[in-house]
Amino acid sequence: MPPARGWRRARKPLIGLLVCLLLLCAAALTGVLWLQAKVESNIQRLPDTFTGLTDRPDKPTSGSAADAMNILVLGTDTRSDAPTTGAEAPGWEPGQARSDTMLLVHLDGDRDSASVISIPRDSWVDIPGHGKGKVNWAYSFGGPNLTVETVEKMTDVRIDHLTVIDWDGFKALTDAIGGVDIDIPKTVYDSARDVRWEAGRHHLNGEEALLYVRQRYGLQDGDLDRVARQQAFLRTLLKQTLEQELRKNPDQVLDLLSLFSKHASVDDDWSTTQMAKLAASLRNLRTDDISYLTVPTDGTGMVGDQSVVRLDPSRDRDLWRAVREDRMGDWAEDNQDLLTPDVVR
């Protein structure tokens, strides 16, 4: 069982803020030196993220797969008032937090497309040294290092980099661009927060956006529907930020990047120079070139007193093989039913 929970802040979900960070970097054609210095002063380095990991999946050495990149993105459910990311955050401590949401971001070798793959936090998996458990327990048990090891063992995909993101940044960006429009197809009621969402279009500020993407109760598929909401909101957020707001005010990109770097922590092998080069390589990536999906599952169930998500071994193997071989475009064509639609429950 995971360490006992202490007082905890209301859980905030993760949407792929890393994608925002990298794509916004790509939009900045000037001010690179200023940007690097600003990010370097704001961002926290996570020590020993990959230290001591053995029997890791091989890194492809030929074809487009050799140039592809896999980034594990985590958001944490904190148990204290201390910041969990950014330069002012303390180091990881056992039991302080679990990874509330987990994404594997695959950047194709040609950098013309990307995939954001959600791994449900309740996925029942093997955690090295701890037996079976929910995938989000790994962060509580052993921090970034054990989380990377757990995901690599589960997927047989080599993780190139890790980032942990604070959800205050999600709220701040939503407010910074003046809110985001979202369509709700059917009226739903969130009994946990006493919020009723009427069918139709809603213009959400940062606080409202958090309520929207955090809802689980009242949705047909619970946590899986919440993951779909997070992905759909991210797609809208990125599109509005990059294709509307920054066209009207290109200089705003530096302010947005400075804001986001305050809420991010990355592995200590990932230098600011490397991040800048990656950002430049993504300059032609459009929001329509990003696919969103959830790892295939086989429903939910109970293990003892734990509500868990059961993964689908057969379809999962096909997905992770496509990631390793940098064939996500072909995989998506054959698995349209697993892609997150623009409008979700």
For each predicted feature, which ranges?
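N-terminal hydrophobic targeting segments that direct proteins to the cell envelope
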Residues: P3-A97
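Extracytoplasmic/secreted envelope proteins and their assembly/folding machinery
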Residues: P47, S99-T101, K132, N136, ...
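C-terminal solvent-exposed extensions
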Residues: L46, R56, A82, L204, ...
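Extracytoplasmic
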Residues: A66-M69, A97-M102, R111-I119, H130-K132, ...
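Amphipathic, coiled-coil-like alpha-helical scaffolding segments used for oligomerization/assembly
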Residues: V135-R196
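Flexible, polar/acidic helix-loop-strand segments at domain edges
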Residues: M69, L173-D251, A264, V344
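N-terminal post-signal-peptidase region of extra-cytosolic proteins
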Residues: F50-P60, A82-L103, W137-M154, R158-I159, ...
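Second-shell loop/turn segments in exported
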Residues: P90-E93, G133-F141, D156-H161, A199, ...
